Structure formats: structure tokens, C-alpha cells
Amino acid sequence: MFSIKPGPRKLPIDNPSLLSWNITDGDLNSKLNTLEYLNCVTNIINACGVYPQDLKDREIISTFHAEKVINDLLKNDYKISLSPDTTYRELNKAAQRSITAPDRIGEGKIWVYQRDTMVERGDNSGVHQYGPAEHFTHIISDKPSPKDKYVAYAINIPDYELAADVYNINVTSPSGQQETFKILINPEHLRQTLERKSLTAVQKSQCEIITPKKPGEAILHAFNATYQQIRENMSEFARCHYGYIQIPPVTTFRADGPETPEEEKGYWFHAYQPEDLCTIHNPMGDLQDFIALVKDAKKFGIDIIPDYTFNFMGIGGSGKNDLDYPSADIRAKISKDIEGGIPGYWQGQVLIPFTIDPVTKERKQIHPEDIHLTAKDFEASKDNISKDEWENLHALKEKRLNGMPKTPPKSDQVIMLQNQYVREMRKYGVRGLRYDAAKHSKHEQIERSITPPLKNYNERLHNTNLFNPKYHEKAVMNYMEYLVTCQLDEEQMSSLLYERDDLSAIDFSLLMKTIKAFSFGGDLQTLASKPSSTISSIPSKRRILININHDFPNNGNLFNDFLFNHQQDEQLAMAYMAALPFSRPLVYWDGQVLKSTTEIKNYDGSTRVGGEAWLNKGCSTYQQLYNEFHALYIDKAGIWSAFEGVFATKNVLAFSRGDSVNINHSPHDGLVIINKGNEEVEGAWPNKLQPGKYKNMGSNSVNIIINNTRKIIPPGKAFMLRGGTLNINIPGRSALLLGKTGEPLNYLYL
């Protein structure tokens, strides 16, 4: 049992008439004022989290009490500032319980349970419904779990409390004293509650809420990583300027199904072979792990983008033969667990709680142990795509891939589940999806499966008043993987992007062009932005740029043409991609949960691609700096390339960046120089720099020469320039990304 004594903290109490609270904790009975109560709540959260093992203690830190506390403080003329506590990571799964079903508490040691009741209907039939339970009521002694004698509790947490999180609450007294506490709140519900109170306009003006800024716009592909792995590294991802994290498909899948050949068990590709969309349970985590991940990411301003497999189903179980999904063995395990007294866990993994018939509008509840797809929901053909059919678009769209049953656009059940899947993802705060293997889908299927389109959403500004929120419009990050290997592919993808202006796409054509330019004998000038031509057929604001993805190293030699010849070329290419306006780079990381290829070597034993580049969580020093440059310049349209001189050769590409850049050599505030050759290059950049504070965001130290004095600027180093023409020395096999970050005092001018 923990103690809720106030502790030694010096509290900013100006008004002794603040609301008092009667608190009971074991043998301790205390009457505390509001700020002492906040101190107790802070101690509980620090020691036990928001879900203490003794469930009755959860009442002490409920959002209901938190809202009363904040109302009390505002009425007594205290100032309040609320901000997400990024140091707090909830480990107890009850905090992420589905809003429609129960879940377990205490890291799998205690189970939450809602009674299964029969609701009678007029035709004398009935439907099972997980009815409301009392809030933290009694132990159900006749429902022990078969595992370790778990105990089942009856519990019901309101939706608004499920969406609550731990916030720092900075309290300033009327005399100016300050203290910071922890509190559990749902900001939107707090606003709605306080609007009904008799607060004055002045009192309302004293409550601000700080929303985290997006740390960048780059995308991290957290391939083959658990949701927990990603959560543990969230602060590092924010530090490295990632604004989005693409994660493995959020479905039910397994890597060791009974129909899976022994030699294929444990491999990464099972993540892309779903066996159920309605229930979330896989080697990366379950629904509660996923909800916790989205919550943690939001604290840092990062959006989660799940991979979405919408056109095939998996082959690990009997479903590949009888086309009943989930497969029989999955349904049997769930039923056995439920009958064994632990229904709360599986019902807690239901992402899609019900479907709505498009004609009758009747709601049908989803149960995890039921069949959700049958033979009528799949293409009739059971033929596999053969090796010589990879450029046959008809075969790609009609046939199976590696034996996986193909879903058609005609199945109302498939479309209904897919649309509901997207809606449920939005409810949990997902602001984008990455649509896998779109090349294998007919346009009609993409049109029906990716609906209704959500093009934009309102995001709260960084620092606003709780009662007068201000928003800015953000575009949803929906993008597709449409593998382009020929001109017909290019035309098909362009047509699809024209039809759906809410979709972006991975730019495979630009990747191939970049690989060729960085290869031995290749010409970097083919990547230069010129007034009369474009570097890609995909509009710049809808381009996702990659230098590697999960498919290329993990399919034998099938995608060797999409691999760079050397790891350093791969890194330099990323510098180029991060420097382009409007587009977003996607950085690959292999979390190695399932078997995969993490390094490809040349014949001489040197690393061709991969190795450290794929295993450092996308957080190498150079990648952090690339992402920082990208965040500074993504929305600045200006780009001007040198077309002659030492910085415009087959081995050297250079261009200015910034809003003021144009063909008339206006002063600029960003400079990119990439030298793929082995020899250093020295010269004067013809476009003048604006005066100000600059930072080397490139991969290597560079020499800047002013008045015959050579200054070495290492990566990450900030320095001041008075402006004008820049004389610079670029080492071989390196990239310079020079960005203006401001003009503060106390920096030495070069």
C-alpha cells in the first residue's frame, strides 16, 4: 500500500479556503487542501502509475476529481498551464482498454471482466452483449483464470477517461509562487466540464494548454518492431525530427501458424498476411499496445501510420483452404480462453466492435470467436502469379500472391469491414495509413477500400487557451506502395493519383533515377532541378522518398535493381532526398522481431547496403541532421542548381534552398552540396548567402574559407556568417546541408 501523504514539497497556497478533500488510504485519514491533494496524486502517479494494483485507489486520481481541482484553482485566481508528461509511459494495459470492451490490468496479472448478458429480442431470440459493469466493483470469485489463478474484476471506465493521459500541471498562485504536479486529464472533456461552471472570463483566461509541436516531417519506417520497442524509443525519435512513424500492419497475424511450412516460420512477411481485421493480436502487440503507442506518440507531436494490407489474407491457418477467416484454430483458441474464464482479454482486442449494414442500417456486433469473412468474399481464382507475369497487370490484380486469397472490390462484407477499420483507426487518433501492394488492386477496390477519404484534420496550435482553442489544418498522410517497374506502371499510378488527390505515393521512379546517378559512372546532374523539366512525375507534395524499404533486401535477388551499390551511396542519396522541397523522406529501420535480412554484402565482403544503416533505429548522427534540415526547408519552394563549374559535375551536385531563391541569384539561406566522388572539391558558390546563424547539417566536417582563413565546421556545429559569397571545401564521399537557423548574439562571425 502506498502513502498519499503530501510530502515535503513547498506548495504555493495563498488562499487557505481552497477546497478540502477527505482522503482515506488504509489506516490514514487525511483532510487535504487542493494543492496538497495534487501533491498526493503526483506521488501516486510517480510511484504506481495511473492504475494502482488496488483498484479502489484508482478513484483518487480519476479525471472527475482532476476537473474539480482545476475548477477550484481557477475560481481562486490561480494560473494553470497544462502540458503532456512525455516522461510518463503507461505500462498497465487497463489504461489503453478498448472503449467497447474490457481488458486486463497489471501487466497480465489481473483480468478485467464485464458480464456477458443475454438481451432478448421480439422474435424470442437473443444476442450476447457485454453489458455495463459497476465502476471498480467486487471480485468475481467464481471466475478464476486457468493461468496462474488470475482474478477477474468487474470494471467500467467511461470513454472520456480512457482517452485521458498524464499531464504536467504548472500552478501559479496569485502572489507568483509556482509548482508543477502530475494529473490525469482529458483536455477536451475538461473544457466541456468547465464551460458548465460559473467561471469568469478573466478566470478562464488563466488556463492554457500546451500541445507538442511536430518535431519534424520525416517518416520513420519501424519495420519489424514491436509497439513496445517503438514506445521505449519515442523521445529519441522526436529528438531526431521524425513527425511520423510507419509501423507493421495492425491486424491479427502470426508467424507460426499450423499451415505454415517449418522453414517459413518466424519470418517478417507474416506481418503482411492478415488473418483478421476485426481483432488485433500479433507478435508486435495487441490492441492495447497499439493504443498506448498512439497515445505516447501524440505526446511528442508524432503521428502513427500503420501499414495496411487490404487486398490479401494470410495462409498460416485453415483459412487459405476453406476461406473462413479467422482460421478455425484461432477461433478455437479464443473460444477456449473465453470458456476458461478470461473473456476480457479477447473482447478487449476487438478493434471493430460492430458493422452497419449499408441497406438496413442494422448494427451487428463483432465477436472475436466468430467468422468474419467466407468464400464469397474472395476472388474465385486460386492461381498464383507466376514469375513471368510481374508486368502483366491483369494477372497482378486477379491472381494470388504466394497463395494468399485475394479480396475483390465486389464483396460488400470486405468493403464494410475495411471502411469500418479506417473509421476505428481515426477514433484512436491515427492520421494516416500506408496502403501496401496497391499495384495488386483494381482501381475500383482502391476507391471503395480507401473511403470515406479524410483529406484534412484540425490540429490544435502549440500554445492556446483551454477555452479558446485555435487550430491549423493539416493534411492526412495517406500514401500507397505502387511498385513501378515499367512505363505502364507509371501511367497506372499517375491515373490513380489523379483520381484520388488525398493519396500520396512512394516514388520508385525517382529512386531508380537516384540509384543510377550515384552508381559508378552515373551523372548527378540528372537529379538537378531545372526550370524546363521535373525530376519526377509525382507532384512534389505527394512524393514519399526512399533509399531502401523492407521488400528490397528480403526477397532474394528479386529487387536487386532497387539497391544501391554501396552503403555510403545509400547515405548520400538520403541527403539529397531530405533536401528536396515538399517531399518527405522515409527512413528504414529493422527492429528484428521476426527473421529478416539486415545486411547485403558485395563479392569482396564489403557492405553493399544495410548493416548499421538499418539497425540504428534511423537515429544516426547524420540522419538526425538530415531530418533537421528537411524540417527547416520542407515548405520552402525555392531551389536553384548550379549548372556549371566545380559544383556542377557528374560527381558533384549543388543547389540553393529557401524562399528567396530564384534564377536571378537572390541571396539564399540554405545550401546543399553532395560529392559522391573520392576527391575533395573546392570552389566559390556563386549564389550569395544571407547573413545569420548557420548550422552544418551534413554528414562530414567541411572547410569554409574566409579571407584566406580556413575554418573546420564539423557536423552539428553552429556558426555565424556575415553573408556574401561562400568559399568552401567539400571532402570526397560527403554531403553538406547548410541551413540558416537564426541570428542570435554571442556567436563568432567567420
UniProtKB/Swiss-Prot annotation:
Alphabetical list of InterPro entries matching this protein: A-amylase/branching_C, Glyco_hydro_13_cat_dom, Glyco_hydro_b, Glycoside_hydrolase_SF
A Pfam family assignment: Alpha-amylase_C
Biological process according to GO: carbohydrate metabolic process
GO molecular function, one term: catalytic activity
Protein name according to UniProt: Putative uncharacterized protein YgaQ
